[in-house]
Regions:
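Conserved AdoMet
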Residues: 2-106
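Core SAM-dependent methyltransferase catalytic element
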Residues: 214, 256-276
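Conserved beta-strand signature within the Rossmann-like core of class I S-adenosyl-L-methionine
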Residues: 242-250
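Conserved SAM-binding loop of SAM-dependent methyltransferases across substrates and taxa
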Residues: 112-127
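Conserved class I S-adenosyl-L-methionine
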Residues: 100-115, 133-135
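Extended basic-aromatic, gly/pro-enriched interface segments that bind polyanionic ligands
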Residues: 132-211, 216, 220, 224, ...
Length: 276
């Protein structure tokens, strides 16, 4: 790998080795170029002038190693991102769930989590939430706690409201599912009661359950290396019911998967796939 910013191939190798022995999750599953960018950004924000300083700190402080790992993850940025996808989900997927007695949904590798809360709002709007079992998984306890106590500042809320109105101009207000305290919006605890939060390593552990009707996994795998992406997609495929839906997000694809993995496109523009 050529030198990228301050992170050389040797520096990256030292960081990976240190994280493997002191941290809670292995970085080998991530794309090296993306890792270099994220590490460089972390160093700039936290005042580390060299990789050696970063490695030294991690070697003597396991809590810092986990703090470092958490900060490398890419958080979701807004509710109802890509409004057309949510519209497609309501019109072409949720309608098929109305006859189900129980709807099982998995949102893996949460970080934030705007995706989870957008999903909960849409399920509630369509009177599907009460019969839904929504699994939200993350390797870090802090990520689970953040999602379980979601709040948005005014500017972030404005973006979510705008996205929501683009997708559903005739629906009720997004603010109806938040409590406003000063300048912050606290997400509805009532909706979050339907969520099963589980600490889970998507790279090494079996799915938290099987027989899912829907897996919402938009653009998380863009950060993974090719082999990890392939194995994750195949594992997620196995956990879906036949006829279940897999949402991977714009910019992703299903190329290179095992021939036993068979999907049909439910929406080519929004990358919503149906298991055959």
């Amino acid at each position: 790998m050529d030198e990228l910013l301050n992170i050389t191939e040797e520096n990256l190798r030292k960081i990976l080795t240190t994280v493997r022995t002191t941290g809670s999750i292995d970085l080998i599953y991530y794309e090296p170029i993306i890792l270099c960018h994220r590490i460089e950004r972390f160093m700039q924000l936290n005042g580390y002038a060299s990789a050696a300083m970063l490695v030294e700190k991690m070697m003597h402080d396991k809590k810092f190693a986990d703090f470092f790992l958490e900060r490398l993850r890419v958080s979701t940025t807004e509710m109802f991102r890509d409004p057309q996808m949510w519209k497609e989900l309501e019109q072409n997927v949720f309608d098929k769930f109305r006859s189900e007695s129980v709807i099982k949904i998995w949102v893996p590798d949460i970080c934030g989590d705007d995706e989870l809360n957008s999903l909960l709002v849409l399920l509630e709007k369509n009177s599907l939430l009460k019969k839904s079992m929504v699994y939200a998984t993350c390797f870090f306890n802090s990520g689970l706690q953040e999602a379980a106590n979601y709040e948005a500042e005014s500017k972030k809320m404005e973006v979510g409201i705008d996205n929501y109105k683009k997708a559903f101009p005739d629906k009720s207000n997004l603010e109806d599912y938040f409590n406003k305290i000063d300048k912050s919006y606290i997400f509805s605890k009532k909706l979050l009661e339907q969520v099963i939060f589980i600490k889970h390593n998507i790279f090494t552990e079996a799915p938290p359950d099987m027989g899912f009707n829907l897996i919402l996994f938009r653009n998380r795998a863009l950060n993974y290396n090719l082999q990890t992406r392939k194995s994750c997609f195949e594992r997620l495929y196995q956990s879906l019911l036949p006829g279940g839906f897999f949402v991977i997000g714009i910019g992703e694809n299903l190329h290179g998967l095992d021939s036993s993995v068979r999907f049909m496109a439910n929406s080519k523009t929004e990358n919503i796939f149906k298991k055959l």
